[in-house]
From Swiss-Prot:
Induction: By bacterial pathogen P.syringae. One of its GO terms (cellular component) is nucleus. GTP binds at residues 469-477, 624-632, 741-744. Residues 737-744 are annotated as: G4 motif. It comes from Arabidopsis thaliana. One of its GO terms (molecular function) is zinc ion binding. Its cofactor is Ca(2+). The gene is XLG2. This is Extra-large guanine nucleotide-binding protein 2. Residues 464-477 are annotated as: G1 motif. Residues 624-632 are annotated as: G2 motif.
Length: 861
C-alpha cells in the first residue's frame, strides 16, 4: 500500500540522512541522501559518491618507471620534481577516521592528489609550477574516475583548498583522482618550459654491433674513419653518414636528433669539418653544412647556462654578448664575472682572462669577491688578485694605502671620487710585459674593436671568382668594367698610377707617329733623288719641323729605343706645350692621317686627345681607364668586392627564382706572370668558387715569342696556358667559365685574316648559304666564335677524367660566353657566372637526392 501511495505523489522531497560508514545497506541507502524519484522529475541534487574502500593492492600491477641509465643523463639538464603536498585539515583530529586494513591506509584518510599528464621534459624546472595545479572541489561521477590506459602521469601536485566545517562533515571523504590531459586545462606548461627552450632530453646512442663498428651497418672497427653525431655521439662510416644524417640542415646530426640541443662537449668542434666530409661533399655543400651547424638556433648556446655576475642571461643579453665588437672567446656554460666599465671578463673565483667590449648591458652587478682577490685594493668595486697588483706596480701605479681605483676601458685610471685621471695603464710597455708574464689579458688591437657591419651569423657567404688569362687577353678589361658597372671606384692613389701609365703610353703612341714621319721623309728624299714625283702628302718639305721641335722629337725616339719613356710624365708640365706644338705641325698631322688605319684602336683613342692628356692637370675618366693598356702590369694581384644590383626582369620573377641582392662576390684579377716558378702561388686560390679564363678571339692572327725565344701563334700559347690551368692540382674540381673576348674586333679581323691561319683551326670550314639575307646564315664572326668555343670544350673534355661521386660518374662542363668592349656584355658574362654557381649547388643537391633515393630503394628491396 505504501508503494502505491508513493507512486501517486507528484513531487517528493529528498530526506537527508547521515552517512553511516559501518552500514551494509544497498547502494541507495549508503549514499549521503535518501532520494525518492517521480516519473516526470529530473534529479537536481548533489553529486553521488561511492563509499571509499580500501582494496588490496597487487604489487605486480603497480606501474613503475624504467631504471634511468647514468649514461643517458645529459649535462646541464635538470628535471622538474614537485614534492607531494598533503592537504591541510585543521578541523579533523589526527586519528579521526584513519584505519589500517591489511596493512594499507584507507583512502578516506588520505589527501587528494591530482596527477597531471605531461609529455615534455624541459631543461629547467620551476618551483612555482606545482602550485598552479588545481584540484576540483566537487567530486564528479564515477565515470570521471576512469583512467585511460594511455594517459601519461606527472609528478606535479598541489594542495587542495580545504572546505568549510559543515561541507567536510556532510559531503564525506575526499578521494584520489587521476586527471586526464584534457582535464588539466589549468596547468600552465610555460612555467616549466621557457620560450625557445623546449628541447626534449635525449639519450646517448647505443651501439648494437661490436666495439668500434658503425652504429647503422655494424661494420668496421676502431680504425675505420667515422663521422660523429654532435647530439647523441653516434658514429657512422663513410657509406652510412648520408643515410643517417640526410641533408644535414643543422649540421652533423642524425635525422632523429634534428631539433635537439648539441652535446656541450662538442661545441668546440662546431664548424670544423672532418676529412671524411671533405671527401664526401663538394666545397659549396661543405660551406653550407658548416654554416648551418654554427648558425642554426638549435645549436646555439642556451642563454640560461651562462651566468654573469650571479644572474643568468636572457636570449637578448646572450645575443648582445656574442655580437659585440670583441666577444668572449670559447664561451662555455658556467659562472662568469664581468666589469662593465673596463671590460674585464673572467670566471667566478679566478683572475681576468680577457678584456671584452665594455658597456654591455648584461648580467647583474659585480661584487667585491668575484675574482677571489685578497689584496684589499679595488678596481671598479672588485678586489683584485695578486698578479693584477703586481702588474699595476710594474706600470707605475701607486698602490700604497689600499686605494680604490676607477679604470676606464682605454686604460686611464683615477681614484674613486676624483674627476681627473692620474695616468694610463696601457701606455707603459712594462704593463703589457707583466700581463704576458702573469697570463693577464691585454686590450684588443684597434682592428679587433671595430664594429661589424652585420652580426657574424647574418653575414652572407662570399663567392670568389678567379679571373685569369693571357697577356692582352681581355681579363684586365673585364676587371675594369666590373668596377665601373658596380660603382666600385678606384682610389686616388690608383688613379694617379693609372694617369702615369696612360701618359707613358701616350708618348709611346707619339713615338710611333714620329718614326713613321722619319720613314716617310726618307722615302720622299729617295724619290726626289731618283727624279720621281710623290703625292702631296709625301711632298711635304723635311724642314717643316723647326729645330726646337726636331730636337724634342729626336729625344722621344731615343728614349723609346732605350725603353725609358717613363721620364716624360713627371715633366708633363714643362713638356705639355712642346707636345702640343709638335702635334700641330702639318707634316705630323699628315703622317698621322696616313698611319691612322694601321694603329691600334686604343692608340687612336688617346692620340685624338693628346693635347688634353699631355697636361699635368689631366684626370683620367672611366672610359680612359677602360681604354688604357698596361694596367695588368700595375700589380700582379687585384680584387674587387661587389654585389649585383637587381634588375626589373629579375624583380618580375617569383621569390624562389630571385637572387639575393645582398650576396657578395669577389672578383680576383690574377696575372699568370706573378705566380712564380711552377705556379706555386696558385695554391692561395684553392677556395675560389669559379675560374673565369679569358681568351682573345683575335689571338689566332697574332704571333708572340715564347720563353725559349721561338715565335709561336698566340692562340696556341693561350691553349697551352689553358691546359696548365685546368690540370693544376689547386684548381681540381673547379668550375670553369671560358670568356671569349674582343668579339667586336673579330668581326673586322676575320675579314682580313682567315681563321685557318692558326694550325689548330685548320679544319674550320663552315657551310655558307647562297642566300646571304637568310636568317639561318649567321655572320662569319659568329660562326668563328662557336667554332672556337667548341674546340676549347673538346680540349677540356679530353683533359679531364670523369669524376666519381657516391658511386656515380659524371663529366665536368666547360661554360662559354662572349664579351666585347660594351659594358652590357661584361655584365651578362658576370651574371652568367652567378647562374653557374647557383646551378652547381642545385645540381649537386638534386644529384644527392637521386643518389640517396636510389640507394634507399635498393636497400629496401
Amino acid at each position: 500500500m505504501a508503494a502505491v501511495i508513493r507512486k501517486l505523489l507528484p513531487f517528493p522531497s529528498p530526506n537527508p540522512k547521515r552517512d553511516n560508514r559501518e552500514s551494509d545497506d544497498d547502494d541507495e541507502t549508503s549514499s549521503g541522501y535518501r532520494i525518492e524519484y517521480s516519473f516526470a522529475s529530473e534529479y537536481k541534487g548533489p553529486l553521488i559518491a561511492n563509499v571509499p574502500r580500501a582494496l588490496p593492492v597487487e604489487v605486480d600491477q603497480i606501474p613503475t618507471a624504467l631504471p634511468v641509465s647514468f649514461s643517458s643523463l645529459r649535462s646541464g639538464i635538470s628535471y622538474p620534481v614537485a614534492p607531494l603536498v598533503m592537504t591541510k585539515d585543521t578541523k579533523r583530529p589526527p586519528d579521526s577516521g584513519i584505519e589500517k586494513k591489511n596493512g594499507f591506509v584507507d583512502s578516506a584518510a588520505g589527501s587528494s592528489v591530482v596527477l597531471i599528464g605531461r609529455d615534455v621534459v624541459s631543461g629547467s624546472s620551476s618551483s612555482s609550477s606545482s602550485k598552479r595545479l588545481d584540484v576540483p572541489e566537487e567530486v564528479k561521477s564515477p565515470a570521471d574516475f576512469r583512467l585511460s590506459p594511455s594517459s601519461p602521469l606527472s609528478a606535479s601536485a598541489r594542495e587542495e583548498d580545504h572546505l568549510d566545517d559543515d561541507r567536510v562533515s556532510d559531503v564525506g571523504p575526499r578521494a584520489v583522482r587521476f586527471v586526464e590531459p584534457f582535464q588539466s586545462s589549468e596547468c600552465d606548461e610555460s612555467s616549466y618550459v621557457s620560450d625557445g627552450e623546449s628541447i626534449a632530453a635525449t639519450h646517448r646512442a647505443e651501439r648494437k654491433g661490436k666495439r668500434g663498428s658503425c652504429y647503422r651497418c655494424q661494420l668496421g672497427n676502431r680504425f675505420t674513419e667515422k663521422e660523429v653525431c654532435i647530439v647523441c655521439d653516434a658514429k657512422y662510416c663513410f657509406n652510412c653518414v648520408r643515410r643517417a644524417m640526410g641533408a644535414m640542415p643543422e649540421g652533423r646530426k642524425c635525422q632523429a636528433c634534428i631539433g635537439y640541443r648539441i652535446d656541450e662537449s662538442k661545441r668546440a668542434s662546431l664548424g670544423k669539418c672532418s676529412r671524411m666530409l671533405k671527401r664526401h661533399l663538394t666545397d659549396s655543400e661543405l660551406r653550407q653544412v658548416m654554416n648551418a651547424e654554427i648558425t642554426c638556433k638549435a645549436n646555439q648556446l642556451p642563454s640560461r647556462l651562462i651566468i654573469v655576475n650571479d644572474k643568468p642571461l636572457s636570449e637578448d643579453e646572450l645575443y648582445t654578448l656574442q655580437t659585440c665588437p670583441n666577444p668572449p672567446k670559447k664561451l662555455k656554460p658556467g659562472h662568469y664575472w664581468y666589469d662593465k666599465v673596463a671590460g674585464y671578463w673572467g670566471k667566478i673565483g679566478e683572475k681576468p682572462s680577457q678584456i671584452i667590449s665594455p658597456n654591455n648591458s648584461i648580467g647583474g652587478y659585480i661584487s667585491e669577491k668575484v675574482s677571489n682577490g685578497d689584496t684589499e685594493i679595488y678596481i671598479n668595486g672588485r678586489e683584485i688578485t695578486k698578479p693584477e697588483l703586481t702588474m699595476l706596480k710594474w706600470a707605475g701605479v701607486q698602490c700604497e694605502g689600499k686605494p680604490h681605483f676607477w679604470v676606464d676601458s682605454d686604460g686611464s685610471y683615477r681614484e674613486e671620487g676624483q674627476k681627473h685621471p692620474i695616468g694610463n695603464i696601457w701606455s707603459k710597455k712594462r704593463a703589457k710585459i707583466a700581463c704576458a708574464v702573469f697570463s693577464l689579458p691585454v686590450p684588443p688591437a684597434s682592428s679587433a674593436v671595430e664594429p661589424y657591419d652585420v652580426p657574424l651569423y647574418e653575414q652572407k657567404m662570399l663567392n670568389k671568382l678567379l679571373l685569369i688569362g693571357s697577356e692582352k687577353g681581355g681579363a684586365t678589361t673585364i676587371y675594369k668594367q666590373a668596377r665601373s658597372l658596380y660603382n666600385v671606384s678606384f682610389s686616388l692613389e690608383d688613379r694617379e698610377r693609372i694617369k702615369f701609365i696612360i701618359q707613358t703610353n701616350l708618348y709611346t703612341y707619339l713615338a710611333m707617329v714620329l718614326e713613321a714621319h722619319e720613314r716617310f721623309e726618307k722615302e720622299m728624299s729617295n724619290d726626289q733623288s731618283s727624279g720621281n714625283v710623290g703625292d702631296e702628302t709625301s711632298a711635304k718639305p723635311g724642314n717643316s719641323i723647326n729645330p726646337r721641335l726636331k730636337h724634342f722629337s729626336d729625344w722621344v725616339l731615343k728614349e723609346k729605343e732605350d725603353g725609358n719613356l717613363k721620364i716624360f710624365p713627371p715633366s708633363s708640365r714643362e713638356n705639355a706645350q712642346t707636345v702640343a706644338d709638335l702635334w700641330r705641325v702639318p707634316a705630323i698631322q699628315a703622317t698621322y692621317k696616313r698611319l691612322r688605319d694601321t694603329l691600334p684602336r686604343n692608340a687612336v683613342y688617346f692620340l685624338e686627345r693628346i693635347l688634353e692628356i699631355s697636361r699635368s692637370e689631366y684626370d683620367p675618366s672611366d672610359m680612359d681607364i677602360l681604354q688604357a693598356e698596361g694596367l695588368s702590369s700595375m700589380e700582379g694581384l687585384s680584387c674587387v668586392d661587389f654585389s649585383f644590383p637587381s634588375t626589373s626582369q629579375e624583380e618580375s620573377l617569383e621569390s624562389d627564382y630571385q637572387h639575393d641582392t645582398d650576396m657578395k662576390y669577389q672578383l680576383i684579377r690574377l696575372n699568370p706572370r706573378s705566380l712564380g716558378e711552377n705556379w706555386k702561388l696558385l695554391e692561395m686560390f684553392e677556395d675560389a668558387d669559379l675560374v673565369i679564363f679569358c681568351v682573345s678571339l683575335t689571338d689566332y692572327a697574332e704571333n708572340i715569342e715564347d720563353g725559349e725565344g721561338n715565335i709561336v701563334n698566340k692562340m696556341l700559347a693561350t691553349k697551352q696556358l689553358f691546359e696548365n690551368m685546368v690540370t693544376h692540382p689547386s684548381l681540381a674540381n673547379k668550375r670553369f667559365l671560358l670568356v671569349l673576348t674582343k668579339f667586336d674586333l673579330l668581326e673586322e679581323k676575320i675579314e682580313e685574316v682567315p681563321l685557318r691561319t692558326c694550325e689548330w683551326f685548320e679544319d674550320f670550314n663552315p657551310l655558307i648559304s647562297q642566300n646571304q639575307t637568310s636568317r639561318h646564315n649567321p655572320p662569319m664572326a659568329q660562326r668563328a666564335f662557336h667554332y672556337i668555343g667548341y674546340k676549347f670544350k673538346r680540349l677540356y673534355d679530353s683533359i679531364l677524367e670523369p669524376v666519381n661521386m657516391r658511386g656515380r660518374s659524371f663529366k665536368p662542363k666547360l661554360f662559354v660566353c662572349q664579351v666585347s668592349l660594351e659594358s652590357d656584355t661584361v655584365d651578362n658574362a658576370l651574371r652568367y657566372a652567378r647562374e653557374i654557381l647557383k646551378w652547381h649547388v642545385e645540381e649537386t643537391s638534386m644529384f644527392q637526392e637521386m643518389s640517396t633515393t636510389s640507394i634507399e630503394a635498393s636497400s629496401s628491396s
